[in-house]
Amino acid sequence: MTEFLHSPLHAEHEKLGATFTPFGPWEMPLKYANELDEHRAVRNAAGLFDLSHMGEIWVNGPDAAEFLSYCFISNLVPLKEGKAKYSMICAEDGGIMDDLITYRLEETKFLVVPNAGNACLLYTSPSPRD
């Protein structure tokens, strides 16, 4: 039997009757009772999504925006403090390795949030280009 990683909210999801599914190395809640009821609740009130499993890559320094723009398909230089941008990182052959969100927290401080299974891969992937 595979041992999955669990978010800090796993016990709460269990108490609420979640049905779980594998997501990379994580076991994540897929649904609770009825999908239509969940949909209506989100449309009429609010919905929460547990992001505990997502990766976090911190990039700091005077050239952080230029470095991230080099690594991703988006130009992050004009991104204003307190804003975020959805982007992607591509493999050498042009295929998409992952989609991610980058937050500019300060002028020289960024938080990159990749999908859970790709955080380690992305952390080690940027390499010099010819």
Predicted regions and their residues:
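Acidic, proline/glycine-enriched N-terminal capping motif
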Residues: 1-90, 95-97
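Phosphate- and divalent-cation-binding pockets in alpha/beta enzyme and binding domains
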Residues: 67, 121-122
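Glycine-rich, Trp-frequent "lid" loop and neighboring beta-strands that shape
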Residues: 101-102
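Conserved small/polar residues in nucleotide/adenosyl-binding loops
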Residues: 123-130
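Helix N-cap motif at beta-to-alpha junctions
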Residues: 62, 115-119
